[in-house]
């Protein structure tokens, strides 16, 4: 039997129709139907390949490492931190 009997569902349906009205329920049903149709169309579009004429990428041969360490030696910057004074506030 369950929690709701068929009589309970009839009462709930009557209350919903009285509260929202048949016109709003019809519009709501139409909107939900269009949303489901759009969702199904989008799902079908995703399953199709985007561009069947695209060829697979050719494998790139591995690049031999050059002597880049000699061409670009690391630069070391040697500085000391200096204390900066707070600016004087004009509103005080």
Curated annotation (Swiss-Prot):
Subcellular localization(s) per the UniProt record: Cell inner membrane
Basic and acidic residues bias spans: 83-92
TM stretches of this protein: 1-21
Its membrane topology: Single-pass membrane protein
Biased composition annotated in UniProt, kind: Low complexity: 65-74
InterPro entries per UniProt: TatA/B/E, TatA/E
Pfam families tied to this protein: TatA_B_E
UniProt keyword Cell membrane present: yes
GO biological process terms held by the UniProt record: protein transport by the Tat complex
A molecular function (GO) term: protein transmembrane transporter activity
Keywords recorded for this protein, A-Z: Cell inner membrane, Cell membrane, Membrane, Protein transport, Translocation, Transmembrane, Transmembrane helix, Transport
Nucleotide-binding keyword on record: no
A GO CC annotation given for this chain: TAT protein transport complex
Annotated spans, Disordered: 43-92
Cross-referenced HAMAP family: TatA_E
Subunit comment: The Tat system comprises two distinct complexes: a TatABC complex, containing multiple copies of TatA, TatB and TatC subunits, and a separate TatA complex, containing only TatA subunits. Substrates initially bind to the TatABC complex, which probably triggers association of the separate TatA complex to form the active translocon.
Family membership: Belongs to the TatA/E family.
Function: Part of the twin-arginine translocation (Tat) system that transports large folded proteins containing a characteristic twin-arginine motif in their signal peptide across membranes. TatA could form the protein-conducting channel of the Tat system.
Name of the protein: Sec-independent protein translocase protein TatA
The organism of origin for this protein: Pseudomonas fluorescens (strain Pf0-1)
Phylogenetic lineage: Bacteria, Pseudomonadati, Pseudomonadota, Gammaproteobacteria, Pseudomonadales
